[in-house]
């Protein structure tokens, strides 16, 4: 399927595909460990159920499916040459706690629709349905990664790190809030920890990785645009911090005798906000916060909190971490407290490959064709010829996959940028445009690949 032939398709083809994607997002949203909310963490029974459902949808779209040794669900549309490398398209099916229904999920389902649209069935005189094939000199493989969020064990990108061959066996000892180790969870899920390296792919096997994702920020909504090219993905470091003071009687302990761990940690959280909010593309968030022993009439002797620190450039992010650390030394020294920390996640910034940024831009341009309107997302209505390009403060699987191949990303508008929240949304029209843009991007890459 060439870009020209895609362009000849009736826009309703993309709308029908988008309707299927939205309906399936709703169906997957019902697979949750917390009825009434959406929570689907790594190696849970819910993870197994969505992998089975995604595999069914992949097979129905003509793909050959398998679950890899790390629990990722894959669907392959081979090229005519079975030894040819593949372009990987996908996202993740795991969620944060009390999540929205599109973060990750919509990208996996859009990838299935794009591969369905692009596939070719060789004319077969025997009348038997010939197997679907990629029309390019590379195969197309849909990846439904697991554990992009790190919601269960704290370390994110576990599924895509296994594919990238950057797995660290120390992760097997990571524990979830119930004390279950990653190793125990993998065994219970039916995986063999000793074979996780079988999930790893060699650079020579891939021509690249493309991911469609909601923006998880307010930019596109504010600009009134449906789609954007992603230039780079923020680097991330995640820490668990402990502040130690002294538990004392809430009534009998005068203030000058207190070593209140909660107040020390509270000052630290405010310092994170003050330091990060004055820097460009540096984002620090304290998302978890607990005080111990946690009684109303006891001065907290210990406080535990998390820090999620991101930056456009690793060096700047690390400089800010040093600044925060110095500030914590001051705060805890003044309050006669002690603090220590454990880093649980560290992923470098990912700069999207220029070629993949270009083909995603071509894909977006293809949606500018007047008349390719879908449910009111009227196109060609004075939107800039040059597609918007955005930095992604949100993390994505491309941060891991970038270790072995080029990465490109397409953003779709999500109203007000609400994400990691049940109100997360994306419109049918923008998903239809996103499917068209992603398919066109692949077709442009196919043409480019033939030329090289
Ligand atoms: O945390 C993130 O930025 C991503 O949603 N995992
Ligand atoms: Mn997320
Ligand atoms: Mn995501």
Regions found by a protein language model. Name each.
Residues 2-44, 171, 343:
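N-terminal capping segment at the start of a domain
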Residues 15-18, 29-30, 181-231, 269-274, ...:
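Active-site-adjacent substrate-binding region
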Residues 21-24, 29, 87-91, 376, ...:
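Zn-dependent metallopeptidase/amidohydrolase metal-coordination segment
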Residues 33-78:
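A non-catalytic alpha/beta surface segment that caps or lines the substrate-entry region
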Residues 39-43, 285-294, 306-313, 338-358:
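A short beta-alpha structural unit
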Residues 89, 98-148, 237-243, 249-275, ...:
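Alpha-helical metal-binding/catalytic segments enriched in His/Glu/Asp
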Residues 135, 147-148, 152-314:
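Midchain, well-structured core segments that form catalytic/ion-binding scaffolds
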Residues 231-233, 249, 253-278, 326, ...:
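His/Asp/Glu-rich mid-to-C-terminal helical/loop segments that flank catalytic regions of hydrolases
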């Amino acid at each position: 399927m060439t870009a020209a032939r895609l362009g000849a398709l009736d826009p309703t083809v993309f709308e029908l595909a988008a309707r299927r994607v939205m309906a399936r997002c709703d169906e997957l949203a019902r697979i949750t460990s917390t009825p009434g909310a959406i929570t689907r963490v790594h190696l849970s029974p819910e993870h197994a159920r969505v992998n089975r459902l995604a595999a069914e949808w992949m097979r129905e779209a003509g793909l050959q499916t398998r679950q890899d040794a790390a629990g990722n669900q894959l669907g392959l549309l081979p090229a005519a040459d079975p030894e040819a490398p593949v372009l990987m398209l996908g996202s993740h099916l795991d969620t944060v706690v009390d999540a929205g229904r599109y973060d990750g999920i919509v990208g996996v389902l859009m990838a299935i629709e794009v591969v369905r649209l692009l596939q070719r069935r060789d004319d077969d005189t025997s009348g038997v349905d010939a197997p679907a094939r990629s029309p390019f000199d590379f195969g197309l493989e849909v990846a439904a990664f697991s554990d992009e969020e790190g919601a269960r064990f704290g370390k994110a990108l576990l599924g895509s790190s296994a594919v990238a061959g950057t797995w660290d066996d120390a992760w097997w000892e990571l524990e979830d809030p119930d004390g279950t180790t990653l190793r125990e969870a993998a065994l219970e899920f039916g995986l063999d920890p000793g074979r996780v390296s079988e999930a790893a792919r060699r650079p020579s096997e891939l021509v690249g990785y493309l991911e469609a994702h909601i923006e998880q920020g307010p930019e596109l909504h504010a600009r009134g645009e449906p789609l954007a090219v992603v230039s780079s993905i923020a680097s991330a470091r995640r820490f668990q911090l402990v502040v130690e003071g002294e538990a004392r009687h809430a009534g009998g302990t005068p203030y000058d005798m207190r070593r209140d761990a909660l107040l020390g940690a509270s000052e630290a959280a405010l310092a994170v906000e003050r330091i990060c909010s004055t820097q460009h593309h540096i984002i620090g968030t304290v998302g978890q916060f607990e005080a111990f022993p946690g009684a109303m009439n006891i001065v907290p002797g210990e406080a535990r909190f998390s820090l999620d620190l991101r930056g456009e450039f690793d060096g700047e992010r690390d400089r800010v971490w040093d600044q925060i650390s110095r500030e914590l030394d001051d705060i805890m020294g003044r309050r006669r407290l002690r603090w220590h920390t454990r880093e649980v996640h560290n992923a470098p910034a990912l700069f999207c490959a220029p070629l993949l940024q270009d083909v995603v831009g071509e894909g977006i341009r293809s949606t500018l064709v007047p008349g390719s309107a879908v449910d009111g997302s009227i196109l060609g209505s004075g939107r800039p010829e040059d597609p918007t390009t955005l930095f992604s403060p949100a993390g994505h699987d491309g941060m891991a996959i970038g270790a072995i191949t080029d990465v490109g990303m397409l953003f779709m508008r999500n109203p007000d940028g609400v994400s990691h929240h049940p109100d997360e949304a994306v419109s049918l029209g923008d998903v239809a445009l996103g499917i068209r843009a992603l398919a066109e991007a692949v077709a442009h890459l196919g043409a480019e690949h033939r030329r090289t």
